[in-house]
Amino acid sequence: HSYGKSAVRELKDMVRACHSQGIEVVLEMPFVPGISANYVTECLRFYMLEYHVDGFVLNPYNVPWEQLIEDPFLKDIKLMQKDDGFQNVMRRFLKGDENMVNDVIWALKNRSSENGKCNYITTQTGFTLWDLVSYDCKHNEENGEKNLDGPDYNYSWNCGAEGPSRKRAVVNLRKNQVKNALELLLTAQGTPCLLAGDEFCNSQRGNNNAYCQDNETGWVNWT
């Protein structure tokens, strides 16, 4: 979302500012199944050449990996595949599902000798970390789709009360669960990815698909 008149200029300025501070910029590009390999390649080329981004996160479906790796314009940039495996294992472990210890150990230690690995427990497509420990079910009523949109299986646990709570025991348990999640994320082999706002327990009030909420629900309030 752009707050000015030129979204193109804003993004270019942001990438330039990040690079000046030694920060690489990696874009997530969620291509839908069935899209042509050439279209995917052209899109990535455009953002790399026009905006000078450093890499892309792609979904694992219908992505022409070999074509991208061999492309002369893209061969030296970072290409990452989105994988919810680590996320789901850690979420189930945190909520207390049985027989998860072996899966957690494997997920913490697993790392390819040939490729890098990025781990995440929350992303922009789903619950925030605070909502993950505050809601058992999604609450997307405000999206106008009769709460049918967004993931149904979140592997979340509300710690004893659905949504905001003033009970000290519930709030303290939620804070401990957030700390547990961050410890798992930061100690796992690979690069940790933290959703913006999770570091201060940002909430979307149970909305796990807030793409259409250009308001306090979807915003991250840094103040």
Region locations from a protein language model:
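Active-site-proximal loop/turn and secondary-structure-junction residues that shape catalytic pockets
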Residues: 29-33, 62, 200-202
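Substrate-binding cleft of carbohydrate-active enzyme catalytic domains
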Residues: 1-51, 58
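Residues that flank catalytic or metal-binding motifs in active/ligand-binding sites
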Residues: 1, 116, 216
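Extended hydrophobic/aromatic segments used for targeting, binding, or gating
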Residues: 204-223
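Repeat-unit-sized solenoid/scaffold elements
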Residues: 42-46, 51, 78, 82, ...
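Short, function-defining helix-loop hinge/capping sites that tune catalysis or transport
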Residues: 30, 36, 139, 206-207
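Conserved alpha/beta catalytic core and glycan-binding cleft of carbohydrate-active enzymes
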Residues: 52, 61-196, 200, 209-213
